[in-house]
């Protein structure tokens, strides 16, 4: 199963784009920091990940999402490649909420 629930802080201004097929894509970058148990010890965890929310009516998020706000994103991980072919994991959010 490919499912991720991630809370974090919005680290860049959200950007809304429309694909050639007319689908809206809201682009976010979320940073998460926490302490996680591993092998009987506490480990500092840090992740910065691109998040994409796709669908209709996403314009309202641009006013709500400000740099530094806390969000919960839930969805699946997908591999993207940049123009040079460098791979990266992107969270394709199916649910997004301010917390």
Regions found by a protein language model. Give the residues of each.
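Single-stranded nucleic acid-binding surfaces, predominantly the OB-fold ssDNA-binding core
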Residues: 1-99
């Amino acid at each position: 199963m490919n499912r991720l629930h991630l809370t974090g802080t919005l680290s860049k201004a959200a950007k809304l784009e429309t694909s050639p097929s007319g689908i809206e894509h809201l682009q976010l970058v979320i940073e998460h920091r926490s302490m996680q148990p591993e092998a009987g010890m506490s480990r500092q965890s840090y992740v910065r990940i691109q998040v994409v929310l796709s669908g209709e009516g996403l314009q309202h998020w641009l006013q709500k999402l400000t740099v530094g706000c806390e969000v919960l994103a839930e969805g699946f991980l997908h591999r993207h490649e940049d123009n040079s072919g460098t791979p990266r994991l992107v969270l394709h959010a199916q649910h997004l909420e301010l917390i």
